[in-house]
């Protein structure tokens, strides 16, 4: 099938699509803050309805709404998205207002532009363009759009338990992906798991004058000492028993890793760093990036950190950490190992609070959805994609794809590029990438539809009264 009409439609409506993205990006929807979440959910639902998707907005009690949408007919494929965004951070680090939606030099700057409103709007635009140029979708797309990705998706996990029928599908399209520093599209067929925690140390009933520092325990030092036992100076996780639970990489994944290379020089330049952890490079760096577990201190808070001098002995100290999990680690296992590890070293007083967790998810490159995505990438970008057997990031993939047995295969791609800086200041997407992602999904839909037609034809040829006789086969 020729996609020239489809591509022309996308190009003619490029400005309109960009303006729709601007509109959503100008609406703050920081899940951790809670302001504007209902309005954002309603705006997303209206955006879905605008392109002909039938919707239903589910209220989730004290959580944020989940929008379900469906369009097309045929075999079902889940399309995941989220409308919440990460906290802005320091405004002084931004070149433009984080919710300005400023377009400068072909890039749209806003918190959520890359993660993940750009992906969501590209999906919706692809549905519109396909229906306008080809008619009804040859497959059924089931959109699941949540507002708690940044909080660990607690409502989504409950939603999957309450509505498992909505998640029964032949495949899942996820909202993560980018073009690397060499402009190659990166496709992921799974995601690391995650557990996000808070460690707390407690001291006096309130902050004290630091003159008491010689005789009153300091929870800040206490926490630092506990943290120092979790990893080695070289960044290796040293929790007792942790490494014994790491599964060896299987032959299929080992083969997939051989085809992946990181643009080490380009990434170091982009990140402005001098080198990699433990001076890794080449295949070892790729392997660690994709299959290495992590323990990251995401932030720390204690005492006085505002402007001006204030000599205090803190009453509390807090650190937030995330663990990215690889086979065979689970959130519950890591939490238990960490608790035991700290207790054995005399840190029973350190409090562990689980803020959010999600299991890992992983699919085969031979799945129908993976093949459709990989083939479409070649067609749109004109180059072979990098296919990650597991993305280094995380999400509620296990909740969405783990409803059925065996798990629903997933493939992920997105609108970002190496300089999008999601979660950081000046988050942005290149509008050219945004438009290419629309064209990308259009072709994925078509390939999945063609696979469906081939399957139906095969069934007709081999079943019941539509079976083709031996003589007919010879005649053909």
List each model region and its residues.
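An extended, acidic, His-containing surface patch that forms the Zn2+-binding/catalytic region
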Residues: 181-182, 238-316, 324-337, 345, ...
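Acidic/His- and Gly-rich active-site-bordering loop/insert found
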Residues: 2-111, 132-139, 321
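Flexible glycine/proline-rich, aromatic-decorated loop/lid segments
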Residues: 186-202, 410-417
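A common structural junction motif
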Residues: 84, 230-234, 339-348
